[in-house]
A protein has these predicted regions:
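Short beta-strand/loop segment that forms part of the nucleotide-sugar
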Residues: 16, 40-52, 74-77
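Acceptor/aglycone-binding surface of glycosyltransferases and processive sugar-polymer synthases
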Residues: 76-94, 98-100, 109-195, 222-238
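Hydrophobic helical membrane-anchoring modules
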Residues: 1-11, 164, 187-277
Length: 282
């Protein structure tokens, strides 16, 4: 990799999937643009991928677009987080010519002030930066015991079945990814449409040799609105775990029995816990 090229001015696109985020979307967009104003090296663009929200999300974004041409909006049917990211990645690469793509939640749970840290590590030669809740310094202060338990078990299964034990937080939604790797992705393999797309994506990037680095983040509660994570997303995530092993044959043979049994145990625990606790994003 040409390290000198990493120090040039980058075109950075922030892909923000939305569905009924009228309470949050304007704030996160303004926070991102504020980070651009705080530096003079790179150019930012923001792409909102809206799944036909039934609230005022689209109208709010269109109003912001009228004031700032760095903001873009594409819409489509509600098919899940993974489908939204696939469409967003393609637009960011083909239409916006992005060098670097950020994944961020649109609900205010990710601290935009950390954006410069992500960019600095990319310019040092890393390919993927993950905002991690599960390395030293990372925190989840608002997680209930059940939510933290489910998240850690899910991550453990992905790490070992997928053969990416070096990654501590496989389901984090706060990432920066060099588009040179996204261009190589086999989206037919990444067939998951829901939140399990996040774990499939990071496994695929690792298998392709991407240099992945994690930085600690504090993952706080959403600022407004309701969580979009449904039971079907949790089930898809669990059922997708054994599939990750087929792209990593050596580790799959070693961990397949553990992974398969873990999926069903995890699914049973999830069903039990959801009767008594609020379970949200993995």
């Amino acid at each position: 990799m040409d390290i000198d090229s990493l120090n040039n001015k980058l075109k950075i696109c922030f892909v923000l999937p939305t569905y009924n985020e009228e309470e949050n979307i304007e704030n996160i967009i303004k926070q991102i643009l504020e980070e651009e104003r705080n530096q003079s090296t790179d150019t930012f663009s923001i792409l909102v991928v809206d799944d036909n929200s039934s609230d005022e999300t689209q109208d709010i974004v269109k109003g912001l677009i009228s004031l700032n041409q760095k903001i873009h909006l594409i819409t489509g049917p509600k098919k899940g987080l993974g489908d939204a990211y696939k469409r967003g990645f393609e637009f960011a690469i083909d239409e916006l010519n992005a060098d670097l793509i950020f994944q961020m939640d649109s609900d205010g749970q990710h601290d935009a002030s950390l954006i410069p840290n992500f960019i600095n590590y990319i310019k040092e030669g890393k390919d993927v930066i993950i905002g991690s809740r599960f390395i030293d310094g990372g925190t989840t202060p608002d997680f209930s015991f059940s939510r933290l338990f489910m998240s850690k078990v899910g991550n453990l299964l992905v790490r070992y079945v997928g053969g990416i034990t070096q990654v501590k937080d496989c389901t984090s939604g706060y990432r920066a990814i060099r588009t040179s790797y996204l261009k190589e992705l086999d989206f037919s393999y990444l067939s998951t449409r829901g939140y399990s797309f996040q774990s499939s994506l990071i496994c695929d990037l690792a298998w392709r040799g991407a240099d992945i680095f994690e930085i600690p983040i504090e993952f706080s509660s959403r600022k407004g609105g309701d969580s979009k994570l449904a039971l079907r997303d949790q089930i898809e995530f669990l059922l997708n775990i054994p599939r990750l092993g087929f792209r990593n044959t050596k580790d799959f043979i070693k961990y397949s029995l553990v992974g398969m049994s873990g999926v069903f145990v995890n699914l049973g625990l999830y069903t039990l816990l959801t009767r008594y606790y609020e379970v949200s994003e993995l």
